[in-house]
């Protein structure tokens, strides 16, 4: 079926110009009017919000000269909660517009993974790519796609669960119906960035009472991280990684809000549902994110218990809602994982063995015999799964290879192999650590340029340049850091002294750590040496957020200690003149 924009000959009713076009224009006009009215109300409330007494920047009434210069004057500026949120919001909007609105902006390049996502969310190549197939693969940024059906209501529910990108994609389709044209990943990027910004601003608002002035630098650091070009490229693409930062940030924001709100609040019903939606976004971003399901269930169960009502009937209803949310998230996550098994499982297993384990084995012949692989397949060692079929002894999808390889070599077979060969496993783990030092620029480029591997980016790379300072270069360093952090969090959780909010935040830290740690071995053990840096994306994202959180906690603890020491020194200095006079 030829696909052009949103029109197809297979769906004549849906493209009838006498029905759809006028309806689209009518809805578009109504949306514009509603947007103007809503915008006016929001702007008015924002101005009132920022003009109230508590939200102003309290400037001390003194001149710069009288206070010892401009620096001393600026130190006396008191930043409020609403002012902090407003500054972080302005910085986020400025970063997004600066990097995505120019004609030359960053985007993702198809490395072969787009097809899997396009099939799941019902997207197809637009006419220019159909006319020239060379532009479909590692050519450059492609932002315009076509689709047959405007909406898929079943895929938005547990009836037909699919990748979580389906949710923002439906909003993009609706906008496309109103404006005409193709499905645009640039519009998709702005929608995803809006969700990330909303989560970040909610975090800044909720954490201000705990962190005070530290909230602003922490919020700006996270903004520079998630809105840098290395992360923006994923939003403007059809990679599975697109929804991971969205789901993770929404999960963190909802968890912090639930942890800090009064226990048993009526609003906890709504926020439990929002938390379930957030973890669903995270666990179904791509198939391998199913490993985050245990952490998601822990969060849902803990807050179901923590916020349970005291009355009997509301308690039963709240408990049933928590159980239902856990069941739906689990069902959708496992459903998405099962869907993906038939799509890429064979290629993944191939690369794990021939492009990974056998390449580092001291005796490849013995390793092949141990894994039950025929000796005639030895020439395939070192080949990834995307060469032409003529390059292999047996084609990747052939029945012969199914019988000789796939029928008895599975992911669990490879796990057992590495457990029997700890030296090889350590080699692969160290490889993963080396790949996690820098954020990769593979499979991303600017819209006006042809793709070249690891092309340098030139707009917003502050976080990319800084993160190599605290990234480990060996596996044992990660074991030491994460082991120490895990023991510290468990101590906080099981000690009686800390407040319950502190215990809940420590549990969140452990859950984010779990999500990242579970992705660490998959990058190399589960995919060999193929796209290691891309496969480490989730781990690096979790690691970066954990580093910022740990840094804020450390500074927060050092500030009271420093003040206590200064007060002790001051008191000691005051006592000395008194002793001399006596």
Give residue spans per PLM region.
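Single conserved hydrophobic/aromatic residue that forms the stacking wall/gate
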Residues: 1-9, 13
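Helix-boundary/low-complexity linker signature
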Residues: 11, 577-579
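Hydrophobic transmembrane helix bundles of membrane-integrated enzymes that assemble
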Residues: 16-29, 33-49, 58, 65-104, ...
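Short, Lys/Arg-enriched, Gly/Pro-containing loop segments at transmembrane-helix junctions
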Residues: 48-58, 561-572
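TM-lumen/periplasm interface segments of multi-pass membrane proteins
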Residues: 100-185, 452-459
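Membrane-proximal stem/loop segments at transmembrane-domain junctions that anchor or position
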Residues: 118-156, 338-451
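Membrane-proximal, non-transmembrane alpha-helical segments
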Residues: 428-481
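Cytosolic nucleotide-binding catalytic cores of signal-transduction proteins
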Residues: 582
């Amino acid at each position: 079926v030829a696909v052009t924009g949103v029109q197809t000959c297979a769906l004549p009713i849906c493209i009838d110009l006498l029905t759809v076009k006028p309806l689209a224009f009518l809805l578009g006009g109504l949306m514009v009017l509603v947007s103007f009215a809503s915008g006016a109300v929001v702007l008015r409330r924002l101005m009132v919000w920022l003009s109230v007494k508590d939200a102003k920047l309290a400037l001390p009434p003194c001149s710069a000269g009288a206070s010892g210069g401009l620096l001393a004057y600026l130190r006396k500026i008191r930043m409020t909660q609403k002012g902090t949120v407003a500054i972080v919001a302005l910085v986020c909007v400025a970063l997004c517009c600066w990097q995505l609105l120019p004609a030359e902006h960053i985007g993702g390049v198809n490395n072969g993974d787009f097809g899997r996502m396009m099939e799941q969310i019902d997207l197809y190549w637009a006419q220019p790519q159909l006319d020239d197939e060379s532009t479909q693969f590692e050519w450059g940024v492609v932002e315009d796609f076509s689709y047959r059906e405007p909406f898929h209501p079943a895929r938005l529910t547990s009836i037909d669960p699919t990748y979580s990108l389906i949710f923002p994609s439906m909003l993009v389709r609706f906008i496309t119906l109103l404006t005409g044209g193709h499905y645009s990943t640039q519009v998709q990027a702005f929608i995803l960035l809006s969700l990330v910004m909303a989560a970040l601003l909610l975090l800044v608002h909720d954490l201000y009472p705990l962190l005070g002035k530290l909230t602003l630098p922490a919020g700006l650091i996270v903004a520079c991280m998630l809105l840098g070009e290395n992360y923006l490229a994923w939003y403007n693409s059809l990679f599975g990684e697109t929804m991971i930062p969205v789901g993770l940030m929404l999960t963190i924001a909802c968890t912090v809000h639930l942890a800090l709100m009064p226990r048993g609040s009526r609003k906890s019903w709504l926020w439990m549902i929002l938390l379930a939606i957030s973890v669903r976004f995270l666990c179904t971003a791509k198939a391998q994110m199913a490993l985050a399901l245990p952490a998601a269930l822990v969060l849902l169960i803990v807050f179901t218990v923590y916020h349970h009502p005291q009355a009997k009937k509301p308690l039963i209803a709240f408990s049933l809602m928590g159980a239902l949310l856990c069941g739906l998230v689990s069902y959708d996550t496992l459903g998405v994982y099962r869907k993906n098994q038939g799509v890429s499982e064979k290629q993944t297993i191939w690369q794990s063995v021939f492009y990974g384990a056998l390449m580092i084995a001291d005796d490849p012949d013995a390793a092949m015999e141990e894994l039950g692989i025929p000796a005639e397949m030895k020439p395939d060692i070192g080949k990834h799964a995307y060469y032409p079929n003529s390059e292999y002894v047996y084609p990747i999808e052939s029945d012969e290879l199914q019988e000789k390889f796939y029928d008895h070599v599975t992911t669990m077979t490879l796990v057992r192999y590495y457990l029997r060969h700890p030296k090889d496993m350590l080699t692969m783990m160290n490889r993963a650590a080396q790949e996690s030092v820098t954020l990769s620029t593979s499979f991303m480029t600017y819209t006006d340029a042809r793709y070249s591997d690891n092309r340098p980016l030139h707009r917003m790379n502050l976080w990319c340049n800084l993160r190599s300072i605290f990234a480990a270069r060996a596996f044992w360093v990660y074991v030491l850091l994460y082991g120490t952090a895990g023991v510290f969090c468990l101590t906080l959780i099981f000690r009686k002294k800390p407040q319950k909010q502190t215990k809940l935040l420590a549990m969140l830290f452990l859950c984010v750590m779990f999500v990242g740690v579970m992705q660490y071995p998959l990058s190399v053990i589960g995919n060999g040496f193929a796209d290691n840096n891309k496969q480490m994306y989730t781990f690096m994202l979790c690691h970066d957020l954990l580093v910022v959180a740990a840094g804020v906690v450390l500074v927060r603890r050092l500030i009271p200690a420093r003040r206590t020491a200064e007060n002790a020194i001051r008191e000691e200095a005051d006592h000395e003149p008194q002793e001399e006079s006596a």
